[in-house]
């Protein structure tokens, strides 16, 4: 069903913001963490880097995910008012925001272990910190796939319409 320009622009914006979010997140796992693992020589340096990275990331990335979901929600609502199905857009939104429960359920133990070590860096073992950061980077790479899949689903719907 043909849609007006504002709905098409909103759909495209949702796909772009979701893709941007995914790329930003993936960059942390495949660029940032490997670089810091190659250059830091002390556990305290690694822990400081992680906590700063986490602080910046948790302020910015959830808001991008919510914004993307709101854009998909607007698109779903607009599509329904013109007689179309908003379900594909809702599925894209839910897929995108699924990164949040993944964080709470899967990543929290690793995050918490790193935060505990940061609270007492003198007692932190370099090998253990490195192992946890590698684990975090792997989990974070998986988490970055949620907004990417949401973008793929959103783009697929744009191409269908």
Curated annotation (Swiss-Prot):
GO molecular function, one term: monooxygenase activity
Uppermost EC category: oxidoreductase
Keyword NAD: no
GO process terms (BP): secondary metabolite biosynthetic process
Oxidoreductase listed as a keyword: yes
Catalysed reactions listed for this entry: emodin anthrone + O2 = emodin + H2O + H(+)
Keyword annotations of the record: Glycoprotein, Membrane, Monooxygenase, Oxidoreductase, Transmembrane, Transmembrane helix
Pathway field: Secondary metabolite biosynthesis
Membrane topology term: Multi-pass membrane protein
UniProt-annotated location(s): Membrane
InterPro entries, sorted: Anthrone_oxy (IPR013901)
Family: Belongs to the anthrone oxygenase family.
Main function: Anthrone oxygenase; part of the gene cluster that mediates the biosynthesis of trypacidin, a mycotoxin with antiprotozoal activity and that plays a role in the infection process. The pathway begins with the synthesis of atrochrysone thioester by the polyketide synthase (PKS) tpcC. The atrochrysone carboxyl ACP thioesterase tpcB then breaks the thioester bond and releases the atrochrysone carboxylic acid from tpcC. The decarboxylase tpcK converts atrochrysone carboxylic acid to atrochrysone which is further reduced into emodin anthrone.
Protein name: Anthrone oxygenase tpcL
Organism expressing this protein natively: Aspergillus fumigatus (strain ATCC MYA-4609 / CBS 101355 / FGSC A1100 / Af293)
